[in-house]
Amino acid sequence: VDIVVSMVFGPKEIEDVLKGENGMLQTSCKDKVWIDLTTSSPTLMRSLAKEFEDAGGYSIDAPVTGSLDSAIRGDMIMFVGGSEIALEKAREVLDRIGKTRRVGKYGNGYVAKLVNNQLWKIHASAIGEAMVLAKKAGLEPDVWWEVMKGGAADSFVLHHDVPSIFAGHYDPSFRVELALKDLDLIQELVKEHNTRAELTNSAHERFKEAKERYGDEAGEMTVCKLIEEDGNVNLQVDGDWIAPWEVKHPNDK
C-alpha cells in the first residue's frame, strides 16, 4: 500500500492506528503517504507524524468539514497541512475525496478544523437561544428563519441545520457525543495557548447537558432541543424537510 487514509473517532484511536499492535509503524513506512482525516489534537498529531516521517514516510493532515450530505455529494472540504512533496504525492487521492484548502505546515489542518468547530458549536447553541427568544416574543420559527437568511447573522449552520430542528430529528447523522469530543479538544487547545474563550466554555456546557439528557447517540442539534425544553416552547414546523442522509449523489438516479 502506497497511500493510507485514516479517519477514526479521536486521538486515542489514531494513536492506535500508528503505534498499536498492528499499527503502521509495525510495517515498513518508507515512501508511504499517510493522509489523516480525523479531528484530533494538533500537538499529538505533530508528534505522531514526526515518528512516521522518521520511519521514511510522508504525512498529510486533512480533517474534513461539511456534513453527511456533503460527503454523499463528494464535495467535502479538507483543511490540508503538510509539505509540498507530501501534498503532491497525495493530491490524486485528496482530489477524489473532496475540495482542498491549503493551510500550511503539518498540524495546521487540525488547528483549522478545531477553530472551525469552535465557531460551529457556538453558533449552534446561539441559534437555539435566538429561536426560543423569537418564538416567546411572538415571531414564528419559520418566519424567523427566512428573515435571518441573507442578513448579518447568516451562515452555513443557519441554512443547513435549522431544518433539522423544524423536523424534530436534530440531525443524528452527527452525534452529540462527537460534538462534545470536538469541544473537549478545543478546550485543550484553548488551555495550551492560554486564550480567553467564555463563549466556547458556555457552548461546551450546553453540549454536555444535551449529552447527559439525550444520550451519546442523539443528534448534534439537540443542544437546541435542550434550550427549547428549558424555555417550554416547541420549534417544530410542518414541511418537507430533507434529512442529510436522504441526499443523493449527483450520479444517482
What residue ranges belong to the model's regions?
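Amphipathic alpha-helical hairpins
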Residues: 3, 9, 13, 33, ...
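Helical "substrate-binding/catalytic lid" subdomain
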Residues: 108-230
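Residue-level detector of anion-binding/catalytic polar loops
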Residues: 4, 58, 100, 140, ...
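Rossmann-fold NAD(P) dinucleotide-binding segment
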Residues: 1-59
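ATP-dependent carboxylate/acyl-activation modules
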Residues: 95, 234, 239-253
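Rossmann-fold dinucleotide-binding core
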Residues: 39-121
